[in-house]
Design a protein with these regions (language model features):
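Loop-rich catalytic cores of soluble enzymes, especially ATP-dependent carboxylate-amine ligases
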Residues: 1-3, 7, 11-123, 130, ...
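Short helix/loop capping segments that flank catalytic or ligand/cofactor-binding pockets
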Residues: 21-24, 139, 147-149
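A conserved active-site cap/scaffold subdomain adjacent to cofactor or substrate pockets
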Residues: 105, 143-175, 179-182
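Beta-strand-rich recognition/accessory modules
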Residues: 120-122, 137-140
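Generic recognition of flexible, low-complexity loop/linker segments
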Residues: 123-128, 145, 149
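Peri-catalytic and regulatory segments of divalent metal-dependent proteins
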Residues: 133
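Conserved small/polar residues in nucleotide/adenosyl-binding loops
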Residues: 189-191
Length: 191
């Protein structure tokens, strides 16, 4: 018999003291350099410190639940959705992103129902760390566990990468070129 259980979603985002959500992609994410820099820094943080993030959700009961008869798996992965994945792939392949995918019209096939727009950000229910519109959902934490440990880990690993990015950009002769190159480099290495 498989083990089933319940977990919780830790909705994690970064907001400035002025209330600006740094994970808000806007209507044209391919043009939102601040968002792309923050996003790719977080990808690096999760990629390089997946072990710490995994440990933050580890305990005997939760380890039996993860990867069993329900999602998410016990392995850390990041899901960005079609829109952001496409933007980063454009950067990698051509050096620039020229457009962002938008939601498609979803044809219900029922004449009495109107067509409606499908969300371009998707929702992947199996990834333990998924981007969902303007935040990440960390889905590994057990239902009885506190989210405090995973938040300490997320904040710390992100802060380390932000510090490194700031040091590099502050030392650059041409900020615009340096930030573009950094976003492309982080995309290439960490997606």
């Amino acid at each position: 018999a498989g083990v089933n259980g319940s977990g919780k979603h830790n909705n994690w985002s970064l907001t400035t003291d002025d209330g600006i959500n740094l994970l808000e992609p806007g209507k044209t994410p391919h043009e939102n350099i601040q968002f792309l820099l923050v996003l790719t820094c977080i990808l690096k943080a999760v990629d390089e410190h997946a072990d710490l993030l995994r440990e933050s959700a580890a305990d005997v009961g939760n380890d039996e639940r993860l990867g069993g008869n329900e999602a998410p798996p016990a392995v850390i992965s990041v899901f960005l959705g079609e829109q952001l994945q496409d933007v980063l792939e454009q950067l990698i392949s051509t050096g620039t992103a020229t457009h962002s995918k938008t939601g498609e019209i979803l044809d219900t096939g029922v004449k009495t129902l109107p067509d409606f727009m499908k969300d371009a950000t998707d929702r992947n229910r199996t990834s333990p760390f998924a981007f969902t519109g303007n935040k990440f959902e960390f889905r590994m934490v057990g239902s009885r566990d506190s989210i405090s440990e995973c938040n300490v880990v997320l904040n710390t690993i992100a802060a380390e990468v932000f510090r490194d990015a700031c040091d590099r950009l502050e030392a650059a002769d041409d900020f615009d070129t340096a930030v573009h190159d950094l976003i492309k480099e982080l995309s290439l290495i960490h997606i």
